[in-house]
Design a protein with these regions (language model features):
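N-terminal beta-alpha lobe that positions the nucleotide/phosphoryl donor
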Residues: 1-137, 146, 223-248, 259, ...
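Single, functionally critical "micro-switch" positions that shape active/binding sites
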Residues: 36, 87, 153, 177, ...
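Beta-strand scaffold of nucleotide-dependent catalytic cores
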Residues: 73, 83-84, 94-95, 104-106, ...
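Conserved catalytic alpha/beta cores of large enzymes that bind or transform nucleotide phosphates
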Residues: 167-252, 257-258, 285-302
Length: 302
């Protein structure tokens, strides 16, 4: 059996299914809303897609509903170590629909292990040999009215007293593609107070379409409007504290709020690459980290 429900996974399963899938299982077990789905173990990559692996993927996908749209996301083994993170180096695909398309997206996730981006990154780390083993996480898509990422510390300085939230309309694809700049918020981790708001001009969003995510113009009255209300920021801050408490350290969290106003977490991983002793000029920018976390392709690409 090559697949397991995400809800059944725990941290100990990271060695077989990858950190992303194991983390989603941990979040579910802690009572935090996570879209349901299944994980494909890393060993499946060594088997032909035409045989039992495909049968397992199709059966697990069909158990989620009648051809539901899903996210197909790489979940490499050891991808978020203390020394380095592979976030954004391997491909993930959004709004994939149909068993054939899901299987193809899984193959594309595996193929990204040998892509130029991932290979170059491994070379910079001095580990250009055999790529890491990779599982795959498949989750029901959230029809996001707004989505974003948040860090339970300052992602540049490492300051543990604040929560950094970035948000944009719809799916996160416009941010990944550099088409819009997200709104930025800073919250006090202690009091929940909003310490800073920077509202950006968000003229584009990606929403569901018949064949995948569709790029749309944002109505004029929302272009320069804040994505998040105070109550939503409060909910995000409380959730961030819960997640950090569960995992025992600063977290980089991807989230979405659906069109009914319900908050879902899409992944959580340790914050890496922050050098507390260095100035901001020596660290990666917050936007670099946001783009890494959001990294995914539209369903059409799969």
């Amino acid at each position: 059996m090559y697949t397991r429900p995400l809800a059944d996974l725990r941290s100990a399963d990271a060695a077989g299914f990858g950190g992303k899938s194991a983390s989603l299982g941990e979040l579910t077990a802690s009572g935090i809303p996570v879209p349901p789905g299944f994980a494909l173990q890393a060993d499946a990559r060594a088997e032909p897609m035409s045989g039992t692996v495909r049968e397992a993927i199709v059966a697990a996908y069909q158990a989620l509903g009648d051809d539901p749209p899903v996210a197909v996301r790489s979940s490499a083994i050891g991808e978020d170590s203390a020394e380095a993170t592979f976030a954004g180096q391997h491909e993930s695909y959004l709004w994939v629909r149909g068993a054939d398309a899901v299987c193809e997206a899984v193959r594309d996730c595996w193929a990204s292990l040998h892509g130029e981006r991932a290979t170059s990154y491994r070379e910079r780390l001095g580990s250009a040999g055999e790529p890491p083993a990779m599982g795959v996480a498949v989750q029901l898509m959230v029809d996001a009215a707004v989505s974003g990422v948040m860090f339970t510390c300052n992602p540049v300085s490492g300051d543990p007293s604040t929560i950094a939230v970035n948000a944009s309309w719809g799916l996160g694809l416009a941010v990944v593609g550099g088409e819009v700049t997200p709104d930025e918020y800073r919250l006090s981790k202690v009091t929940g107070e909003v310490l800073q708001r920077t509202v950006a001009r968000k003229h584009l969003e990606y929403t569901p379409g018949p064949e995948g995510a569709v790029r749309r113009d944002v109505p004029d009255d929302r272009i320069e409007a804040p994505c998040l209300e105070d109550a939503q920021l409060a909910a995000l801050g409380e959730t961030a504290r819960r997640v950090e408490g569960h995992f025992g350290g600063p977290q980089d969290i991807e989230w979405a709020i659906d069109r009914d106003g319900e908050l879902f977490l899409l992944q959580s991983r340790p914050v890496t690459g922050v050098r507390k002793e260095s100035g901001a000029s020596e660290s990666r920018s917050a936007m670099d980290l946001v783009m890494d976390t959001f990294g995914a392709r539209r369903g059409e690409s799969s």
